[in-house]
Amino acid sequence: ESVNFRNKKLDESNRSDNLAIGITTYIGKKKSSISSSNLLKENLDTLIEKCIETTKNTPEDEFNSLPDKDLLAKEVKDLNLYDDTHLKNENKIEYLERLEVSASSDKKIVNTESSFTEDKSNFILANSDGFSKGYKSSSFTASSVIVAKDDKSMERDYEYTSKCHLQDIN
């Protein structure tokens, strides 16, 4: 979800949900990858077939292969990459209103653009040797682009912050 402001006014608010799959196949020392957001079974079957055919026509690389089974992770450490907080659009708008007012405080400022974006992801890795692990991650990003003008020139600059946890955004 993202909210965008321009010159202290709400410009747009977007939400999108994406679901996709990525498939990598190995044949000997050959490897290829393919991805799709069409998760219908018949498409997945076609996707796998295409990936295998592509792999057959890919040059060998001595470093391409699945890891030995004894090297596979047994546990995945929690790296604290996920914050399940969901910030309401009203809160994003309030944050951006304060940001835009602060950014426009100098009379030389002629244009401002600010945005607040919230992303959530779920990653799963599985292979034919029985490995299947995953993790969730989140991202909260605030950014601002400011244009200043005086008698002789115009200058543009930006600032942003991106954190896994909402509480870490200043």
What are these regions (language model features)?
Residues E1-N170:
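Active-site bordering "gate/hinge" segments
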